[in-house]
């Protein structure tokens, strides 16, 4: 607390997460009182909460424990915490761990006393997998390489004030599924396994009042925003080319936001990109280099799974590799990785205070690529 109490990101202190012994009311209230005193003594400016665990079962709302908190927090079960507020409207309430689905969002959006939610989780993580061979949780808005997933764009369409639009293709029945997960799989591509004439189901996430969908320049119709925050959907007869969504709002002076997906051809080359060009020579100085398998026109090939090898020279070293495949058992500390959904990443660290770094990516049958980086910069 003393280390972080002046940091502007601190808005609440938590006295515990999913404490299972709260049914012993007097014991748990005594412990909680001591914790609250420590928080208030060391920082009287910020409120204290606790992530209650099934408080209806442990009677936390009726035995006085919840009302010891400045802000009542509960994990999941949004209807319970809303009922607790209705029971006692002076309670300030917050979701301390919540799912990322639409029902959870609507509980927040449509109930002003519900001050906010902490979503589990922002990024996919190792562990808590559903079943072997999956070794990670796919519940994040971002995958393990930092790429925004469809759920992330969906949440952005609910939360952001900046106009946005994102197209996602729902994986057809029989098409390869790439994750073990409960929600239908969506991919940001227009390259299905089946290239013969058939229908594809498309979801568009957008906070714009109107979205119009185009396939190869032909309009497939415009749809208004749904009051229940559900995505706008189209059934699209597949043909190769460009699928484009255009989002519009009133009083935009004709300006619009767009997103498009393009059908990929055969894999032809590796394209390298990085999140920075200079890497500080310190413990957390790291650069993420993304290797994308593309066709001859530079269009990413989403189904490519080539084994990509990385070689580095100069003042750098490969710290780890990854591809965001939650069923992959490949080692992270290596210099090669299979592409997953057409891409993988290498994490590069500086091996000297200054100097040039060259990273090359190769794979059988693909044109190789090299990216120039440098050690140095802010420390």
Which stretches of residues belong to each language-model region?
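Active-site groove signature of glycoside hydrolases
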Residues: 1-26
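Substrate-binding clefts and catalytic carboxylate motifs of secreted carbohydrate-active enzymes
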Residues: 11-14, 32-55, 63-71, 76, ...
């Amino acid at each position: 607390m003393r280390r972080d109490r002046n940091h502007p990101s601190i808005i609440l202190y938590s006295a515990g997460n999913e404490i299972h012994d709260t049914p012993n009311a007097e014991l748990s209230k005594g412990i909680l009182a001591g914790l609250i005193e420590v928080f208030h003594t060391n920082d009287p400016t910020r409120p204290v909460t606790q992530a209650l665990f099934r408080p209806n079962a442990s009677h936390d709302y009726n035995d006085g424990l919840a009302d010891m908190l400045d802000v009542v927090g509960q994990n999941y079960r949004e209807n319970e915490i809303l009922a607790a507020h209705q029971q006692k409207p002076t309670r300030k309430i917050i979701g301390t761990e919540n799912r990322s689905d639409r029902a959870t969002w609507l509980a927040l959006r449509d109930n002003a006393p519900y001050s906010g939610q902490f979503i589990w989780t922002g990024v996919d993580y190792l562990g808590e997998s559903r079943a072997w061979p999956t070794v990670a949780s796919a519940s994040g808005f971002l995958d393990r390489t930092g790429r925004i997933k469809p759920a992330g764009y969906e949440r952005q369409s609910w939360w952001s004030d900046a106009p946005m639009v994102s197209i996602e293709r729902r994986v057809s029945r029989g098409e390869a599924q790439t994750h073990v997960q409960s929600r239908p799989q969506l991919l940001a591509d227009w390259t299905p396994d089946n290239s013969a004439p058939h229908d594809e189901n498309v979801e568009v996430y957008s906070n714009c009042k109107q979205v119009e969908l185009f396939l190869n320049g032909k309009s497939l119709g415009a749809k208004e925003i749904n009051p229940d925050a559900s995505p706008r959907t189209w059934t699209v007869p597949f043909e190769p080319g460009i699928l484009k969504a255009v989002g519009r709002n009133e009083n935009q002076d004709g300006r619009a936001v767009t997103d498009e997906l393009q059908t990929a051809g055969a894999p032809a080359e590796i394209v390298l990109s990085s999140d920075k060009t200079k890497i500080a020579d310190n413990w957390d100085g790291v650069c993420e280099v993304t290797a994308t398998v593309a066709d001859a026109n530079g269009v990413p090939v989403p189904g490519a799974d080539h084994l990509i090898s990385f070689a580095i020279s100069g003042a750098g070293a490969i710290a780890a590799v990854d591809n965001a495949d939650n069923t992959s058992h490949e080692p992270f500390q290596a210099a090669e990785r299979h592409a997953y959904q057409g891409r993988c990443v290498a994490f590069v660290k500086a091996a000297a205070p200054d100097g040039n770094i060259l990273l090359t990516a190769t794979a059988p049958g693909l044109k190789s690529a090299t990216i120039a980086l440098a050690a140095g910069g802010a420390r």
